[in-house]
Amino acid sequence: MLDCKEAYELICKAIDRKVKFNELETIFGQNKTDIKNDNEKTKKVKQEDNYIDIKRFAANFYKTPIVNYKGYINGSKNLYSEIIAKTLVSEDFVKEWGKLKPVRPNHFDTGHNHSESVDINKLQISNRKEEILAKLLFYQRGVKDLGYIFDYQTPLKAVKSDSYGKIDLLGYNSKDKCYSIIELKYRPSGSEETLLRCVLEAYSYYKLFGLNQIESDQDHNGITELRALKDYKHTKNAELVILFDEKSCIVDDGGAETNLMLRIVPKDASNPHYPTKTVESQQYKECKELIDSSKHKELQTLCEEILAQEPHLKQIRFVVLRADTDSKSSYPTNIKGWSRKLDRLYRAETLLTIPSKG
């Protein structure tokens, strides 16, 4: 049976790193000195304790600082992320994700509506630009080469104290006839999260999401509009999509045309702003390496293992999001103050698809 503490310590040992003080407690909700009781009175209690450990480990592992480590382990030619991915597979830890179960009775009680009235200036007063971008993609509905977006910030918690996050975007891929669990990564200064973290986060959310609720829901605006599409058909199949920016550019590098957002300063949302230097996102860097070299072969193997143990997971897609400055489509009419000079429509480009072999 899985022991969360022992599993995490083993992974840390593999990358030559000590578990930091209070890390187990703050990330997994488990004290470092906790000892599993081998004298449980009933098998049922043991099973319940084991499931608690599974939830602690699998649902929260993507939050650990080690999955975002970049570069090489001291004194070796091995990337941190590669050794972590390899250990998850070789020690069968990846199988623990397969045991996660949804806990929220209704994911679609948020009232999200494609046509809700929005003021672009009020929307942009927040520094949480990734969430704002998710909303803008939701309001756009169809994103070329990504799919039809029917919800954003989909909640997974059953109660407030649950540690689970929210799915950035839910989409429908009409080409491959599957739902898309979309993990969006964006920062105006360039996102620094590793692909390992992105994949584990997306997979955790997939397991904690009750996909059958899409079919049973009767009230959610996005699902109602999805059902009206001529190429839509309900399915049990899904894909994981890692969606990211290529780079954030200064003006001289074409930022006015290519940056995903220009209203990046909340106190001056009526004017365009740019980063102080052009920065390529970590996801784009690693995706190029995944395609062009064997630098991330253990990540590839981890993705293949995830797909092998999930019969309804068709593929994992790595997708770059782009500003569609040539689009002739009309802007979302529900967004007051939307400007072609300052705001964007979006398109996507799939860089890599890892398919299920099943």
What would you call each of these model-derived segments?
Residues M1-G358:
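Charged, terminal alpha-helix-loop-beta segments
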